[in-house]
Amino acid sequence: MQRKIVLVNQHSGYLFLDVVNAFAKEYDQVVLMAGKVVTMDDPLDPKVTVQKIFPYNRASTFKRFMSWIVCVVNIWWLLLTKYRQHDLLLSSNPPVASTLIPLLFRRRTSLLLYDVYPDGLVATGFVGVKNPIFKVWAWFNKCAYRKVDRIITLTDGMATTIQQYCPKEKITVVPAWSNVPTVEHSATKEENPFVEAYGLQNKWIVMYSGNFGKGYHLEPLVKVAENFRGYPDIVFILVGEGWQKELLSSRIESHGLSNCKILPYQPSAFFLHSLQACHVGVVSLTESLENVAIPSKTYNLLAVGHPIFCIGSVTSALARFLEKHEVGMTCDPTDTESMTRFIERLYVDKEYYRRLSDNALIVAKSHTKHRARDILELVAAGAQNRP
């Protein structure tokens, strides 16, 4: 009997594509339903069929929700008419798919939850726990999660949140992983295309790369840059786009900070080079992620041997992770004095920097693409155990 599976992710990045490729090695037919596929160095296995679905639209809250709803209808119709005999692995993108689709079909279904909804709406202040949207969505979760074979998530905090909807025996934690090879921190410093493109030769680089959205604590990083005016070789680089860009640019300009630069998102060919170029990687946590998620960029920074500087809650899942493995430090967004001391210590104390860097490489070796294989095995086992 042929094994067929449909994997669904409205906006598929490297973590999900690694999972898809793992299934392609074992299953007879593999279909990826995605509105957008973002590949890095590893292309999709040619065996995989890509089925386009309605793309994610983050232009506004209304458009975001509408793109979720339209996408779920799109998925439902395709499963009803074109992929009637396939097992399912549904991600939480779009969020309503992992709640509604299991209720609409009787077939082997597993969930891969990167986010937990409706709890994420509460964390961002969009609704309260007494709001009818929260109550109805939570009730549907309990009905849907009762029907699925396996729920896979990324952190213990997320697993704890999911337990309100189903027995903990159904839930397995598989941590995220890096998309880059584990390499020594200084492996390509001398002739790095990213360094050459932006004139960063002989600079000691503190870098944030990602979303400049409202919930990210990036202004404190610019404030810290002000404290390093007397260090001509230390620079602060912010790579990305988003709502805060104009605010950050204005502060940099008004304070005459020649040691702080904003760069646009880099082409994929520069991704690994930009990671290797910096000396300290910055991660900012939004309040909605503090207790449930560890951003995937964390693992990429570890893979190139960088100490990590987190701006966010000192009691977050990431803060505990950094402290446990001694690979970095978390500072409250208001504590720019501690931020300054930490960066200065990394710069001055070479032995301390090397210890954190070596620890990062050790941790990275346990967070590689073999985790995608773990997800494959969990889904396959769940399918075999279903009567």
PLM region descriptions:
Residues 195, 199-216, 222-225, 237, ...:
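Conserved donor-binding/catalytic core segment of Leloir-type glycosyltransferases
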Residues 216, 267-274, 281-302, 307-320:
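Nucleotide-sugar-dependent
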Residues 104, 131-153:
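Membrane-proximal helix-turn-helix segments that form the acceptor-binding/catalytic region
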Residues 157, 174-177:
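Carbohydrate-associated surface elements
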Residues 1-45, 228, 387:
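N-terminal subdomain of nucleotide-sugar transferases
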Residues 338, 345, 352-366:
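A short, well-ordered alpha-helix in the C-terminal region of glycosyltransferases
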Residues 14, 70-75, 80, 87-120:
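An aromatic- and histidine-rich active-site surface loop
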Residues 231, 239-240, 246-272:
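Nucleotide-activated donor-binding/catalytic signature segment of Leloir-type glycosyltransferases, i.e.
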